[in-house]
């Protein structure tokens, strides 16, 4: 089956597949970057994205917000300009607006919310 590329604004998904956002250490920069490198949309989950940082227990939300730009940058580096890197943000998250602002400032290609 031939899958046609999909254009989203000025970006092209060579492979129109969106990797699902899976939280707490699954959907982070390595997986999202690898999917994007193959021409799909890799997705970083915001759910406890900074769980492995040493100060996570003291300030989990602050650490998660700090970890996101790093995760986005690393995913984009892995992708090498291919595909798209998105972030999945649950709308019930207490700091939803802060997450959206943070990932937009970090240059994410798309946001998936639900």
Task: Describe the residue ranges of each PLM region.
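Active-site entrance/lid segments in N-terminal catalytic domains of soluble metabolic enzymes
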Residues: 1-114
């Amino acid at each position: 089956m031939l899958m046609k590329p999909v254009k989203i604004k000025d970006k092209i998904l060579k492979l129109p597949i969106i990797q699902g956002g899976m939280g707490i250490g699954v959907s982070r920069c390595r997986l999202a970057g690898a999917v994007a490198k193959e021409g799909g949309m890799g997705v970083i989950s915001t759910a406890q994205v900074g769980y492995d940082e040493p100060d996570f227990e003291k300030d989990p939300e602050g650490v998660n917000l700090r970890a996101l730009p790093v995760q986005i940058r690393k995913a984009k580096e892995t992708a090498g300009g291919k595909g798209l890197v998105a972030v999945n943000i649950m709308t019930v998250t207490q700091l939803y607006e802060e997450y959206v602002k943070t990932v937009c400032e970090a240059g994410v290609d798309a946001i998936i919310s639900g």
